[in-house]
Amino acid sequence: MFPAYIRIISALIPDKTLRQQIRDILFQRNDWEIRKKESEEAQFAKLLERVRQQDLHDYVRAYGKIGELLDILRPYRCIGAEKARIGSGKDGGYAMLPPDSGNIAYSFAASADSPQDLVMAEKGHQVFQYDGTIEAAPDSHPNIHFHRNNIAAPSQNTPDTKTVGRIFDDLGHQGKDNIILQIDIEGAEWAVFEEISEEQIKQFKQIIIEWHGLSPFMEGFNRRLSILRKVAQTNTPIHVHINNYGYPRNAEQGLLFYGDAYEISYVRSDDFAFEPDEAAYPTELDAPCNPARPDIAIGKW
């Protein structure tokens, strides 16, 4: 026999898939049925306690902020160009415009697994990896050039980190306009893009980035919206995907079906004409970062 609150969910939500997603979120897994009843009840009690810390107006304001965020990140279609998924079919793969020949690729935070970098190298692009958390490049290829440095904004730079401007200088890339940037630096991206100049950001023909900390209940959310607006002045989003590893963390705050890390693919706005993207997200190009949980449905803009 299921606990009483499970039977209530089943009665109120007739859609089987949606019902299962709610259960997954509440219990932070897909195999919740085999857990002990006491563990399930303890987790549900924890969720209720978190939710009680907010009132209805808090959630109205929070979802209003999420609405602002989605408006800033509204994706557009590039007229005359189609997206493709590059890299892994799971976490580590991204939807972007297929790069033409002769591009330069920057990979900030290569990590222990960077399938997109290897694909880019195999297609003939020169890939410059920067990651101070690993000893060497995860893959060996003559087109991959590894640097054991983390990335920082100028105001936070240290002898062991590199700024975007310093990398341009080191590699002789000042003025280059054919650079594709892939960046996933676990929150440090905000200071980098807050301080980057318009001249520097325009050197990137595509930016594939994971923005972290996009919960309206997190401190600094309004600052992050301002930085996203700054990026949108020169770069247009063409693809949006939410990392579903944030399910449990946001569910504990009462934000069901939400994640606070967004994977966004941008192109330089000057390079294309655009039209509204009428697709429902996630699309066929997407895959859940955590395959054990369903992807987060955004829908249509």
Where are these regions (language model features)?
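Boundary detector for helix-to-coil junctions that initiate low-complexity/charged tails
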Residues: 1-47
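Short coil/turn segments at beta-strand junctions that form active-site/ligand-binding loops
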Residues: 101-103, 125, 175-179, 203
